[in-house]
Amino acid sequence: PEAWPAVKAILQDIAAKLEDGTPCCDWVGEDGAGHFVKMVHNGIEYGDMQLICEAYQIMRDLLGMTADEIHQVFADWNEGELNSYLIEISRDIMAFKDEDGEPLVEKILDTAGQKGTGKWTGITALHLGIPLTLIGEAVFSRCLSAKKEERV
């Protein structure tokens, strides 16, 4: 806590900013409060990634869209209110081709690991009685994904 006043201006100057200029960096409290905030942030990111994965699967498997068509959908989404780093990199991944000119996305191993922050967010939500179903399902999907040999 004593160091915050000394570094606040530096950190807030280099931090991302909201549209109104408010820095996306602030002191959130003592005793691991910042770590808790980061854990929740990562849990939300798990949910976002799960939504992106499910949207991709629906477009590819149900709608029969090509990687180029899916790329365009993500590009359109990234121009509107869904604009985000995760949508942007999903858009970019859809455009990558391998040395044969085929979509690289189809050659990426379909397993996902985890470091635990999504799981910790879900466990904390359960302890607090907060329904956090998207993050919980995202964690379960990652657990299933990691067991490729058992699920395929």
Language-model segments: what does each one mean?
Residues 1-18, 39, 50, 58-63:
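Rossmann-like NAD(P)H-binding beta-loop-alpha module
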Residues 4-7, 70, 135:
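Small-residue helix-packing motif on alpha-helices
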Residues 15-46, 63-82, 86-87, 91, ...:
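Conserved Rossmann-fold dehydrogenase catalytic segment
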Residues 39, 54, 120-121:
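A general alpha-helix detector
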Residues 47-51, 117:
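Catalytic-loop motifs flanking and including active-site residues across diverse enzymes
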Residues 103-152:
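A conserved active-site cap/scaffold subdomain adjacent to cofactor or substrate pockets
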